[in-house]
Amino acid sequence: MARKKGTSTRKKQKKLSFDYGVVHIKSTFNNTIITLTDKDGNTLTWASGGTVGFEGTRKGTPYAAQLAADKVAREALRMGIKRVDVLVKGPGPGREPAIRTLQGAGLEINQIKDVTPIPFNGCRPKKRRRV
């Protein structure tokens, strides 16, 4: 069946309205992924070093994390979110610049929590690197 003339194929975007969100920052040495969720954990928007235009080793830089955080913060403010909790995971260099950018963009940060997984004597670690 052919599509009628004058109709669009784009979906209608739902008008989302929240006042509170959770920002998850996963910072590795290769990339930083920033996800904005509602309080139930449903993803609203996300950005990473790759989605803001960096490739390869530059995705892991603090500047890439800063731009990704700015993109998420602008989207959050557009949705009406003003207050956020920040959950940080991982040891990468993008942790602090991302938090500073979220705060500088106008989001009110309630709490910052480090949720980096630490094993309680779990799996045997990889052998030590010899250079």
From Swiss-Prot:
Recorded GO molecular functions are: rRNA binding; structural constituent of ribosome
Keywords of this entry: Ribonucleoprotein, Ribosomal protein, RNA-binding, rRNA-binding
Q: Mind listing the GO biological process terms from this record?
A: translation
By its UniProt entry, which InterPro entries does this protein fall under?
A: Ribosomal_uS11 (IPR001971), Ribosomal_uS11_bac-type (IPR019981), Ribosomal_uS11_CS (IPR018102), Ribosomal_uS11_sf (IPR036967)
Annotated Gene Ontology cellular component terms: ribonucleoprotein complex; ribosome
Domain of life, per the record? Answer: Bacteria
Q: Which HAMAP family match?
A: Ribosomal_uS11
| Protein task | Located on the platform of the 30S subunit, it bridges several disparate RNA helices of the 16S rRNA. Forms part of the Shine-Dalgarno cleft in the 70S ribosome.
**Similarity-based family:** Belongs to the universal ribosomal protein uS11 family.
Instruction: Note the PANTHER family from the entry.
Output: 40S RIBOSOMAL PROTEIN S14/30S RIBOSOMAL PROTEIN S11 (PTHR11759)
The record's section on NCBIfam families has: PRK05309.1, uS11_bact
Q: Quaternary form?
A: Part of the 30S ribosomal subunit. Interacts with proteins S7 and S18. Binds to IF-3.
Designated name of the protein = Small ribosomal subunit protein uS11
Organism in which the protein naturally occurs: Thermotoga neapolitana (strain ATCC 49049 / DSM 4359 / NBRC 107923 / NS-E)
